[in-house]
C-alpha cells in the first residue's frame, strides 16, 4: 500500500511513498 491518510481521530497511516507532514518516515 502506498500513499497516506489521516483519520479524524488524528491517527495516520503512511505508505512507502508517503511524504505527508505529521507522518513518521521510515
From Swiss-Prot:
Keywords attached to this entry: Copper, Metal-binding, Metal-thiolate cluster
Protein residues bound to Cu(+) 4: 12, 20
Residues noted as binding Cu(+) 6 in the record, renumbered to the chain: 14, 18
Annotated binding of Cu(+) 1, by residue: 4, 23
Binding site for Cu(+) 2: 6, 23
Residues annotated for Cu(+) 3 binding in this entry: 6, 20
Keyword Metal-binding: yes
GO MF annotation, one: metal ion binding
Binding site for Cu(+) 5: 12, 18
Additional comment: The seven cysteines bind six copper (cuprous) ions.
Family from the record: Belongs to the metallothionein superfamily. Type 8 family.
Protein name: Metallothionein-like protein CAP3
Organism: Colletotrichum gloeosporioides (Anthracnose fungus)
